[in-house]
Amino acid sequence: GVTFGNNTFVGVGSSGNIVRSTDNGTSWDNATTDNSTANNLSGVTFGNNTFVGVGSSGNIVRSTDNGSSFSTVTSPTSNNLFKVAFGNNTFVAVGSSGNIVRSTDNGTSWENTTDSNSMLYVSWSEVSEVGSNSQIRVKSYDNSSWSTIDGDGNNGINLIGSRNATNPSMADNGTHLFAVWSEDDGAGNGLIRSAVYDNNSQAWDFLNSNYQALNNSTSNSANNPQLLYNNSSLYVIWSENNGTANQVRVRQFDNSSSWNLVDNIGANTTGINKDTSRNAINPKMMNFNSEIYAAWSESDGTASQIRVAKFDNSSSWTFVDGNSSTGINKATGKNATDPTMAVLSTKLYLSWSETNADNRTQIRVKSYDGSSWSFVDGDNATQGINKDYTQNASYPQLVTVTEGNIENSTDNGVSWNNATSYSSSSKLYAVWLEENGNSQVRVAEFDGTSTWSFKDGDSFDGLNINTAKITGKPSAVAYLNQLIVAWSEINSLGVPQIRVASSPF
């Protein structure tokens, strides 16, 4: 790397070599350095009359005499550092495994900063060792080891440990980890609970000071919540029975203690269903073109339809699925369930499970360019992207993995968020569960046009640890430029285990 400052060019390179020129690059001399380890240096910058270089094994050097001599400073990381920059009296360096370090004292001392993309979180529902109630458990992964962050006791993060809790969902805004789940009220109704993890106290705090559930009515049962962090706001979507039918409800967090309903469509104040007299289930949200899109499965009286609506970030939802009595199904007379969404380049992709004429469920995929929907699964009436279209496939997940993340900080480098980036190197993956005598976790990659290629070995079996054992529905996320897949799988003792795998598989 090379930089310029105070009429001086400074270049850094292999084996800790540092050179400088004070005559506009005509001649160069070696700078003196105490870099005894001779680590390679790859980045250098200038700010506030100081040159700072960074390199392998977390090596950091600085010069305050116009590049004549460099001294090694204590680094908070042993990960390789690639680049360094200066701004607002702060040096920031970035490196491998999502590592980001900063200095606010002219490069004298450095600290690790919070990078939301450097931690992986997994949550699930597990029966307690004491009693028979299911608890919400949470673990974090720092790219080397797993840590329990739910108290590690008999109870998880349930509000009431003696109540069953299921269907957790999490979201990270860069400074806090949020969780929602459905918890039994003791009478068989599901209550949507919400909590935030405090990194300092390492404890979970409930987002409502009076522990009020998020349900529109706590006398109604609600389930399948999902969180989405969008435009500095936190949203939650879920399905709630109003005594007549299941309604899709949405709330927005005010970043303090209140959740406000934002689920009106015109005169409809009971949710965002197309028909509020019909059941709507399994809702999901995704950010696309700076707006929130929601997709869910809703009955039309004959079959379940995939419905899609978008939110204007104010108060209004608009259907983008044709706004007719049917949705975007391949066959509107067949049941379609479990929608999932992701964004690749300039398009929104939506996948779901739909029954074909042979009563076999297929994984279907459509893309949306902001005005129209197109099938990208072969557009075949009989088969979707299943490994074997004669077998049932269900619970799809879509994930975009970008090779090279963009991080942004608005607090002088203290914390960092993963910015939305869909470069030409981004890849779209589909993950689902498919039968072959046993349930298998399957993974396929989209080529951006019309072809899906299997990335799970492309054989009879999928990712399962033991392909002869039953698995539960998978979950998938992007983490440090990799696809991470988690699922529940029965072990040899007949006990479900949470399994996690990373690409390449």
Language-model region placement:
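Extracellular, repeat-based ectodomains that mediate carbohydrate processing or recognition
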Residues: G1-G5, F9, G13, T33, ...
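Loop/turn residues immediately N-terminal
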Residues: G16-I18, G58-I60, G98-I100
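Acidic carboxylate motifs that coordinate Ca2+ or other divalent cations, activating on Asp/Glu
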Residues: D23, D65, D105, D411
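Short coil-to-beta transitions that initiate beta-strands within beta-rich domains
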Residues: D34-T45, P76-A85
